[in-house]
């Protein structure tokens, strides 16, 4: 179960400042969540609304086997969603750090 502090933390990620500071972002929608999980991004948690969880049991089972999965109320889900009509599923994903590569021939000014 998500605590109120976690809910506030995830809703803060809607602001660019906090996404950059925490090196995390939220993806919304089943397709985007699945794409993020297929990539090399590290998923912290998958969050679903109660309505979505009741509607799509197979997705709940699929994600809960391998990841922390939380089911929250519709009102709480709207706090972490950026869209006006959220689908009911989102994931908190870490931004991978990529070192800057400079070839020996290039110069930094």
What is each stretch, according to the model?
Residues 58-64, 100-103:
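Short loop/helix-cap segments at secondary-structure boundaries that form the rim of catalytic
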Residues 61-94:
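Glycine/small-residue-rich loop that forms an oxyanion/phosphate-binding "nest" at active or ligand-binding sites
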Residues 34, 38, 75, 102-109:
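RNA substrate-binding interface of SAM-dependent RNA methyltransferases
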Residues 24, 44-46, 68-70, 87-91, ...:
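Structural motif
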Residues 1-57, 61:
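Boundary-proximal intrinsically disordered activation/regulatory segments immediately upstream
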Residues 33, 54, 78, 97-99:
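Glycine-rich nucleotide phosphate-binding loop and flanking beta-alpha elements
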Residues 92-105:
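Glycine-/acidic-rich phosphate or pyrophosphate-binding loops and their flanking alpha/beta elements
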Residues 10, 28, 72, 93-96:
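Short gly/ser/thr-rich secondary-structure transition/capping motifs
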């Amino acid at each position: 179960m998500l605590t109120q502090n976690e809910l506030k933390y995830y809703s803060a990620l809607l602001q660019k400042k906090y996404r950059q500071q925490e090196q995390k972002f939220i993806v919304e929608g089943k397709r985007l969540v699945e794409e993020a999980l297929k990539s090399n991004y590290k998923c912290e948690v998958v969050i679903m609304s109660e309505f979505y969880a009741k509607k799509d049991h197979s997705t709940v089972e699929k994600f809960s086997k391998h990841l922390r999965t939380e089911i929250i109320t519709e009102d709480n889900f709207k706090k972490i969603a950026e869209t006006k009509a959220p689908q009911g599923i989102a994931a908190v994903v870490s931004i991978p750090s990529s070192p800057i590569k400079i070839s020996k021939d290039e110069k930094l000014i």
